[in-house]
């Protein structure tokens, strides 16, 4: 009976659908090897080439970006330096303009003071000249009037010019002395 039972069991083992046949295993291994060889020989190098190209492109892009960034930083620093220099130049120009303005104002003030002093001096000179002219004119007129009045009062003719000139000069000198003493006395009180 064992033989009877062993025969169906051996046949059942042979027909087990879960276990593949040996030929299928061998054929699958050959196809897998061919497929592995094709992938290793053709696909992998292409993947490596594409990977290398992309890596180089990315690294080149990064290098270019770093170069551009360095150029941009250099340009920015240059522009900031130029801006700083322009600000310093503008401040220097403003300071020079302020100094020149102050100098011009001082020169104009000095010139105005000199002009005012010159005008005052000219006015004083002109007034002094007019005063001298008036004094001279008054002396001549006062002398003539005083001589004729004195002649009428005294009843004598004072026609002698030398004598009348001396009398007039003495009279005017006395007047000036009186005037000077009054001015000195009036200034003290």
UniProtKB/Swiss-Prot annotation:
Q: Where in the cell is it found?
A: Cell membrane
Which residue stretches, if any, does this entry annotate as coiled coil? Answer: none
Q: Recall the GO molecular function terms of this protein's record.
A: proton-transporting ATP synthase activity, rotational mechanism; proton-transporting ATPase activity, rotational mechanism
Annotated transmembrane regions: 23-43
Look up and give the membrane topology term: Single-pass membrane protein
Gene Ontology CC: plasma membrane; proton-transporting ATP synthase complex
InterPro entries in UniProt:
ATP_synth_B-like_membr_sf, ATP_synth_b/b'su_bac/chlpt, ATP_synth_F0_bsu_bac, ATP_synthase_B_chain
Chief localisation class: membrane
Query: Keywords for this entry?
Result: ATP synthesis, Cell membrane, CF(0), Hydrogen ion transport, Ion transport, Membrane, Transmembrane, Transmembrane helix, Transport
- List the CDD domains hit by this protein, alphabetically: ATP-synt_Fo_b
**What is the top-level taxon of the source organism?**
Bacteria
Kindly give the Pfam families that the UniProt entry links to this protein.
Answer: ATP-synt_B
Q: Which PANTHER family does the protein's record reference? A: ATP SYNTHASE SUBUNIT B, ATP SYNTHASE SUBUNIT B', CHLOROPLASTIC
HAMAP family according to UniProt: ATP_synth_b_bprime
UniProt family annotation: Belongs to the ATPase B chain family.
Q: What does this protein do?
A: F(1)F(0) ATP synthase produces ATP from ADP in the presence of a proton or sodium gradient. F-type ATPases consist of two structural domains, F(1) containing the extramembraneous catalytic core and F(0) containing the membrane proton channel, linked together by a central stalk and a peripheral stalk. During catalysis, ATP synthesis in the catalytic domain of F(1) is coupled via a rotary mechanism of the central stalk subunits to proton translocation. Component of the F(0) channel, it forms part of the peripheral stalk, linking F(1) to F(0).
How this chain assembles, per its entry, is:
F-type ATPases have 2 components, F(1) - the catalytic core - and F(0) - the membrane proton channel. F(1) has five subunits: alpha(3), beta(3), gamma(1), delta(1), epsilon(1). F(0) has three main subunits: a(1), b(2) and c(10-14). The alpha and beta chains form an alternating ring which encloses part of the gamma chain. F(1) is attached to F(0) by a central stalk formed by the gamma and epsilon chains, while a peripheral stalk is formed by the delta and b chains.
Name of the featured protein: ATP synthase subunit b
Name of encoding gene: atpF
